Amino acid sequence: MATRDSGGGQQHTNRHADEVEEVAAEGNDASDLKERHEKLSEDVDSLLDEIDDVLEENAEEFVKGYVQKGGE
């Protein structure tokens, strides 16, 4: 009796290639996410530095302005 090859091995190879591509895409996403995180961290640090500078120069005026705008 003759046996027939269903080509299942080839499908396994294709699935493996798909998994490799998926992992590579996830790696790119992680890299993009890391870059965004670093950029946002830099922006936040810059903003905090600017606030510190304003407070060092005229903290009393800053507080008066805050209270006048409804702050407590």
From Swiss-Prot:
Keyword list, A-Z: Coiled coil, Isopeptide bond, Ubl conjugation pathway
Protein known as: Prokaryotic ubiquitin-like protein Pup
Family: Belongs to the prokaryotic ubiquitin-like protein family.
Domain notes: The N-terminal unstructured half of Pup provides a signal required to initiate unfolding and degradation by the proteasome but is not needed for pupylation, while the C-terminal helical half of Pup interacts with ARC to target proteins to the proteasome.
Subunit structure: Strongly interacts with the proteasome-associated ATPase ARC through a hydrophobic interface; the interacting region of Pup lies in its C-terminal half. There is one Pup binding site per ARC hexamer ring.
Region of interest (Disordered), ranges: 1-41
Chain segments carrying region ARC ATPase binding: 28-66
Lipid metabolism as UniProt keyword: no
Cross-link Isoglutamyl lysine isopeptide (Glu-Lys) (interchain with K-? in acceptor proteins), sequence positions: E72
GO BP, one annotated term: proteasomal protein catabolic process
